[in-house]
Amino acid sequence: ASGSQGPVAQAPVALVFCAVPSRSAARYGAKGEQLFCIQDATIACAYAQLAATALGLTSVWIGAVHEPEVVQEALRLDDGLWPVCFLAIGHPAESPERTTRRRLSDLVHELPR
């Protein structure tokens, strides 16, 4: 359901972040149903990934749920819950070498005054 993503099957913990489109639609209309609920789920996943890293764990974000109906059925999700992304979490199998961080000037662009 995650498109042959082995980390989900191998990880000791796999979290599924879901949206509730109807709840967002009730408050924000079509944008809530089609966009805001997905943004909320992905933001929650990003914070969970940061928390895992802070605990010394490693994680893999899988941001495409190719067969949401299969996930809904397999996890017995309530109607209205829409799986948006997965986060596989575990202890690192190895300690990879740290990569060089990009310079702030490569990431931030100032607007002219």
Which ranges hold each PLM region?
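Acidic, surface-exposed loops and disordered segments
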Residues: 1-113
